[in-house]
C-alpha cells in the first residue's frame, strides 16, 4: 500500500511537470508569434495604435501617469539583452560608434531647433522637437538595421553608447537650444536625474541581472522584448490620446515637421559617411541610428518637465520614423537583391 502511494505521487508529479512544460511551450510559441508579428508589421501596428488612441482617447489617456514606469521596463529589457560581446563590439569599431553619437547629438537637436523655427511652432510644441532631437537612438533602430541588411553589431553598440551618454548630453542640448530661445524655464539637473532614473538605473539593473543569473532566466529574457514592444505601443497610445485636441489643431503640419527632422538624419549621415568612405552596411546602420530617436523617452521627459503639448512631437515622430525606417529598409533590401541578380 505504501509503495502504491509513492508510485501514485510520482505519477502525479510527473504529470504536473509534463503539463507545466506543455504550458510553457505554448506560451513561448505565442510569444514567438507576437515577435514575428511586430517584426513584420511594426509600422502598421504603430499606425493602428495611434489611430485607435486618436479616435478613442478616453480608452488610453488613463495610462499617461504610468508612462515613466513603462519606459523604465523598456530600458530594463534592453539591459537584459546586453552582454559582454556588445561592449566588445564597441571597441572593435570605436570610430564608427563615436561618429554615430557625434552626428546624432550634434545634428538632431539642431535639426529640431531649425524645424521649430521654420514651422513657427509655439514654444510649448517647439521645445518638443528639440527634446526629441536631443534624445538617444531608439531600440527599433536595431530591428530596422537588420531588415536593411545593415551592420547590426554597430547599430546595437551605437544605441547602447548613445543611451548611456543621454543623462549628460540630452539635458545639455535641450538647455543649449531651447533655453536660449524660449521663455520656458529649463533646468539641467532635474532632467539629468529623470534620465538617470528612467534610463540608466533600469539598464544597469538589467545588465547586472544578465551577468549574474542570465542563464537561469532565459525564458524571462525571451519574453521581455515582446512586453517592452507592447509598452512602447501603450506609451504612444497614451500620448496620442492626451494630445488628441492638439494634434487635431496642428493637423498635417506636425507630421510634415516630424518627417523633415527624421529624413534630415538620413541625409546628413549619408553625406558624412560618403565623405569618409564608410562601407555600405555600416552606413545604413548609422543612417538608421541617427534618424530613429528614442521618442518614448522624449515623451516621458516632456510630460514630466514641460507640458503635454511638448510630447506631441515625440508621439507623431514615433509613427513617422517607423514608417520611414521600414521604407528605407525595403529600399536597401531591394537594392541588394538587384545586385545579386546582376552578379549571378
Describe these PLM feature segments:
Residues 11, 23-344:
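Alpha-helical transmembrane segments of multi-pass small-molecule/ion transporters
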Residues 2, 11, 15-21:
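Short, positively charged and aromatic/hydrophobic N-terminal segments
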Amino acid at each position: 500500500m505504501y509503495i502504491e502511494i509513492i508510485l501514485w505521487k510520482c505519477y502525479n508529479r510527473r504529470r504536473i511537470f509534463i503539463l507545466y512544460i506543455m504550458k510553457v511551450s505554448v506560451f513561448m510559441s505565442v510569444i514567438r508569434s507576437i515577435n514575428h508579428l511586430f517584426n513584420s508589421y511594426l509600422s502598421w501596428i504603430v499606425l493602428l495604435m495611434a489611430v485607435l488612441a486618436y479616435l478613442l482617447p478616453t480608452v488610453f489617456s488613463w495610462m499617461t501617469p504610468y508612462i515613466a514606469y513603462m519606459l523604465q521596463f523598456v530600458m530594463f529589457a534592453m539591459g537584459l539583452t546586453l552582454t559582454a560581446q556588445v561592449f566588445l563590439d564597441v571597441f572593435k569599431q570605436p570610430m564608427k560608434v563615436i561618429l554615430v553619437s557625434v552626428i546624432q547629438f550634434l545634428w538632431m537637436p539642431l535639426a529640431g531647433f531649425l524645424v521649430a523655427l521654420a514651422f513657427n511652432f509655439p514654444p510649448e510644441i517647439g521645445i518638443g522637437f528639440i527634446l526629441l532631437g536631443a534624445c538617444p537612438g531608439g531600440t527599433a533602430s536595431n530591428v530596422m538595421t537588420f531588415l536593411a541588411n545593415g551592420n547590426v553589431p554597430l547599430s546595437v553598440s551605437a544605441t547602447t553608447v548613445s543611451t548611456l551618454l543621454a543623462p549628460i548630453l540630452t539635458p545639455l542640448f535641450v538647455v543649449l537650444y531651447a533655453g536660449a530661445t524660449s521663455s520656458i524655464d529649463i533646468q539641467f539637473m532635474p532632467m539629468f536625474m529623470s534620465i538617470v532614473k528612467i534610463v540608466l538605473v533600469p539598464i544597469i539593473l538589467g545588465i547586472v541581472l544578465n551577468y549574474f543569473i542570465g542563464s537561469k532566466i532565459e525564458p524571462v529574457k525571451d519574453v521581455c522584448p515582446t512586453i517592452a514592444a507592447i509598452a512602447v505601443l501603450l506609451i504612444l497610445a497614451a500620448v496620442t490620446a492626451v494630445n488628441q485636441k492638439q494634434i487635431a489643431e496642428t493637423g498635417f503640419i506636425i507630421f510634415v515637421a516630424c518627417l523633415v527632422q527624421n529624413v534630415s538624419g538620413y541625409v546628413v549621415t549619408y553625406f558624412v559617411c560618403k565623405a569618409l568612405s564608410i562601407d555600405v552596411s555600416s552606413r545604413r546602420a548609422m543612417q538608421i541610428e541617427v534618424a530613429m530617436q528614442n521618442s518614448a523617452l522624449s515623451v516621458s521627459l516632456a510630460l514630466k518637465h514641460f507640458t503635454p503639448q511638448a510630447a506631441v512631437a515625440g508621439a507623431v515622430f514615433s509613427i513617422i520614423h517607423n514608417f520611414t525606417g521600414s521604407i528605407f529598409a525595403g529600399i536597401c533590401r531591394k537594392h541588394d537583391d538587384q545586385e545579386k541578380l546582376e552578379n549571378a
